[in-house]
Design a protein with these regions (language model features):
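A glycine- and charged-residue-rich anion-binding loop/surface
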Residues: 1-327
Length: 327
């Protein structure tokens, strides 16, 4: 997640020195599909007002433009990368402004334009990629279970969760949710390799790749597919094999607006952490109920409560309230 600096930076960024950077350098190159570490050069530095500066002192926040960068800029629902400039700064977030890939940093040492630096993407990237690939499988599973009328209406992919909005006229039943969840997990177990291709937009559409409605695409697009299960136009980062996703668990299904539903889910380490939290809650419940079978214990308690209520009701009606024996 990025800092308050970016969340409140809309007006500032509108007046930023991006045009000057574009004219001087053009768009910088993203190499993060293949590389998570790189040696790069600082082309430009921007302060909190998005204005060009020659340097950032230690302890300051600002934006950095590298000549080449492994940091993915937030796009297509996928959060921006974090990481570090080795020995120099923590990378808090990465965003795209007018085609420029810029990283928000908090410096540990001074940074200057022209510095040669080493960049490392943080470990969250791998988890984000797993959740992004799981989102593609979820989309495919929804179309398989509910029908091909399903169309993506929005998404958000982070390292510990995913959210997928889609067109559908009514809430999913428990059975439908289970079918979707099971199908995604079955596909994960097949261990299909991911395949990425860059092709002409029309060629991609003819190949059966799913494109987002009303989305503007370049003439050449990136197509991500997993076996014969999923094929979508996507610029995000993904696993190399779907078994890297681990397990997949739907945590919530809800409505967003008329005709739009939302599924929230977790996979990989986040799914394991969720399972552990469920287990901890179950053990706590067993301790509280003094029973190894909490469901039966709850049913027994409900029966006892009903019996006591009946006793109380009868006592009130007979005028014997003061002499109730509840044992």
């Amino acid at each position: 997640p990025y800092t308050t600096l970016f969340r409140s930076s809309g007006d500032k960024s509108a007046k930023g020195d991006f045009k000057e950077l574009l004219e001087k350098f053009g768009e910088n190159k993203f190499i993060g599909y293949e590389e998570l570490k790189s040696k790069s050069k600082i082309l430009a530095l921007l302060d909190e007002e998005f204005k060009n500066v020659d340097s950032l002192d230690a302890g300051k926040e600002g934006w950095v433009m590298f000549d080449v960068t492994p940091f993915y800029a937030q796009s297509g629902g996928q959060c921006g990368d974090s990481g570090k400039i080795v020995g120099k700064a923590n990378v808090l977030d990465t965003q795209k402004f007018h085609g420029l890939n810029l990283s928000l940093v908090k410096t540990n040492a001074a940074l200057k334009v022209g510095d040669e630096v080493e960049l490392e993407v943080g470990s969250d990237r791998a988890e984000t990629a797993r959740h992004h690939s799981a989102t593609h499988l979820l989309h495919a599973a929804l179309r398989s279970v509910l029908g091909t009328h399903i169309a993506q209406a929005g998404s958000n992919v982070e390292a510990d969760r995913l959210r997928f909005d889609f067109s559908h006229p009514k809430a999913l039943t428990s059975e439908e949710i289970s079918k979707v969840e099971n199908l995604v997990n079955e596909w994960i177990l097949t261990g299909a390799n991911a395949k990425t291709q860059v092709m002409e937009l029309e060629e991609a559409k003819k190949s059966g790749a799913i494109a987002l409605f009303n989305e503007k695409y370049a003439d050449k697009v990136r197509v991500v597919s997993f076996g014969d299960v999923s094929k979508e136009l996507c610029g995000g980062t993904h696993v190399k094999n779907i078994d890297e996703i681990g397990s997949f668990f739907i945590t919530k299904e809800s409505g967003v607006s008329a005709g739009v539903r939302r599924i929230e889910a977790v996979c990989s380490r986040a799914a394991l952490n969720l399972a552990r939290s469920f287990r901890a809650e179950l053990e706590e419940l067993k301790d509280e109920l003094k029973s190894t079978e909490p469901l039966n214990a709850v049913k027994k308690l409900k029966g006892e409560i009903k019996g006591l209520k009946d006793k109380l009701k009868n006592a009130k009606s007979s005028g014997e309230l003061a002499f109730i024996n509840v044992n």
